[in-house]
């Protein structure tokens, strides 16, 4: 399988445009849930937001095994990333340079930690 670089860049930029400072990740959580469901992932959100004073819980999901033998014999595989971004995390603008580098416009952080991992996972 090869990676579609243009799609990955578009996805990354879309993720960086979602405001997701710590404790205010609701928009990111909703986006991730929507996209994961589109990919046939069974999606859940826990209730940790209530306990920590945030507005979104942890999102987790799984792809069910397609056959009984796979369900019984395959080892689980975990992919993990976080949704929040350090401040200043709102109104981010990604800039794609001619040499392929992606940076912020200088007024905020880019949010590559951890939107880069989320883009790859999706």
Give the positions of each predicted feature.
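N-terminal capping segment at the start of a domain
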Residues: 1-23
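Catalytic cores of large soluble enzymes that bind and process phosphate-bearing ligands
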Residues: 4, 20-24, 28, 109, ...
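Short amphipathic alpha-helical segments, especially helix-boundary/capping motifs
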Residues: 5-10, 36, 94-100
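Predominant activation on well-ordered alpha-helical scaffold segments within soluble catalytic domains
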Residues: 9, 13, 30-33, 118-122
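Bulky hydrophobic/aromatic packing residues
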Residues: 12, 28, 78-80
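A non-catalytic alpha/beta surface segment that caps or lines the substrate-entry region
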Residues: 21-73
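Active-site metal-coordination/substrate-binding segment of hydrolases
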Residues: 55, 62, 73-122
